[in-house]
Each structure stands twice: as structure tokens, then as C-alpha cells.
Amino acid sequence: MPLDYHALKSRPIAELEHRYDARDTILYALGVGLGADPLDAGQLRYLLERDLVALPTFATVLAYPFMWFDDPRWGVDGARLLHAGHALRMHAPLPARGAVFGRTRAVVVSDKGAARGALIVLERTLSDGPGGAPIATQTMTLMARGDGGFSAREGNGPPGGDAFAAPRAAPPEGPPDAVVELATLPQAALIYRLVADPNPLHADPAFARAAGFDRPILHGLCAYGMAGHAILRAYLGMDAARLRAISLRFAAPVFPGDALRFELWRTGDAVRLRATVPARAGLLVLDAGEAELG
């Protein structure tokens, strides 16, 4: 069954409440690399129940309908779906424990052709309850590699689907003014999936091979959370309340065990960033990064 344009666009993909406790908040922080120095007070504020603080990027895993693409109504080939980019804007601090309400909907479904696949942009809003005060808004850009050509089917959306032009940030100029190096554990994806995305692409070697990878890859949002950690460390004294927004493009897969080198440029409250893997010939894995500080 081909991707169903009207099914995706006509209704929310999910509306759900997500209850979480201190253990979930701490497990997420461990999953994105905090705790490497267990004596660092800046890291411990996200790892100890007393006066616990939630990382802003924890919002990326809350009230999200993981494995939504398994629902046959959408006609999406989940095995060939890749996360291409993510943007998060915080409207209020995320509670360290409690409940949030999330609404996820497809705002763009674009047909790039049978050979190139389709592009899907999901928007998710988080609030403190249905119709409540907003906490965060985020967009997730997905490449549906197996779903191109859907608009050739009569009545399945406008020709080419929705128009979409990805925003392109100009590359930073000059050397970075801050560099943060963060390692990932070989078991990083296995830890992260306990509180986040259970997609077998990140845990099952056979599934990863079927998707075209030699082995399971690290979740894009795990690397994204590490980028947030790098910003907090470089500029904000590990103060989560001052990270207002962050967006990134996933340029290449990160593998568990990779060490990431984050390069950052700051102008006022605006930050540009990218990440490479030095041990893989300096491969660029996170690109076009932008953040807003408060």
C-alpha cells in the first residue's frame, strides 16, 4: 500500500498524555552522555533526585508516538524511514517529573519521486494538558526512502505533494570559539532506547542490515541531546533554563562508540554548531546547527 497523503494530513497522528518520573528524567540524561564525570556538580543536577532538573532536549522523547509508522493507515515504509533533522523551541521549563500532553501531526508530505523517496515533516506540541499552557514546539523532518512516487497515484494528494524547501543556514566563518568533545558508549543506543525510541534499527543487527546499515546506528535524537549538552557546557554553565531553541540536520549516521567533536560559534545569544567524528576521518555527522540562548 503506498503512502496515503490524505490519511497523514487529515487528522493528528497522535494525541496522548505522557507521565514520567525522576527515574525517566535521569535515564534520559545518562543516555545522552551525562555522568561521564560523576563528581561534576553541573552534570549531577540532572542525575540526582534532590533538586532534579530536566534537560530541555528531554522534550524530544515525551508524548511522541514511537513506531507510529507501523499503523497501516499511513502506508509508510517504516523500515526505510530516516530522521533527517529536528528543531525544538522551549516555551517554558520542562518539569523534572509529572505529565505532559502531546499532539503530533504531519504538516508537510512532499513527493521527491520514486527514486528519491518522500519527505515528511511532523510537528509536535507539548503542553501541561489538553488546551493547557505550552511547554515546547518541535518539528521532525523524516526521509521516507521507500515512499517516493506516491503522488502519481490518482487522488493521492497534489502533484509532487506539498511544496517544501528546507531552510539552509550559511556555514560558520572562521575557527570555532568553543570545542566540546563527548564520547558515546558502545551500549549507548541500548541505554537510550529504554526511555526513548524502541525502534529495532538501533538495537537489532539483523534489522539494521535490512535497512542498509552494517550495524545498529545511534538514535539521531540521542546525538541531538548530546548537542544540547555541548551547548550547556560551552556557554551556559549547565543551566538548562537558558537554552531556548536548538535545530540540527543529521548529515550522517552516528554509531554507538563514536566520539563526537562539537564545534560552536557564538554571536550574542545565537549559536551555530556542527559535529564531526574525528576517528572516522573527521566525518561530518551533525550540520546546520543553530541555537538560541536566553
Regions found by a protein language model. Name each.
Residues 1-101:
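Hydrophobic, proline/glycine-rich low-complexity stretches
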Residues 202, 206-283, 290:
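Catalytic-pocket segment enriched in acidic/His residues
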Residues 21, 60-68, 145-147, 152-153, ...:
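Phosphate-binding glycine-rich loops and adjacent basic patches that engage nucleotide phosphates
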Residues 8-9, 68, 74, 127, ...:
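General secondary-structure edge motif
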Residues 1-14, 64, 83-179, 254-257, ...:
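HotDog/MaoC-like acyl-thioester-processing domains
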Residues 2-47, 158-223, 230-233:
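A contiguous, surface-exposed recognition patch within enzymatic or periplasmic domains that forms
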Residues 29, 33, 59-60, 105, ...:
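Residue-level recognition of well-ordered secondary-structure positions
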Residues 7, 12, 19, 43-47, ...:
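Residue-level preference for alpha-helix termini and adjacent loops
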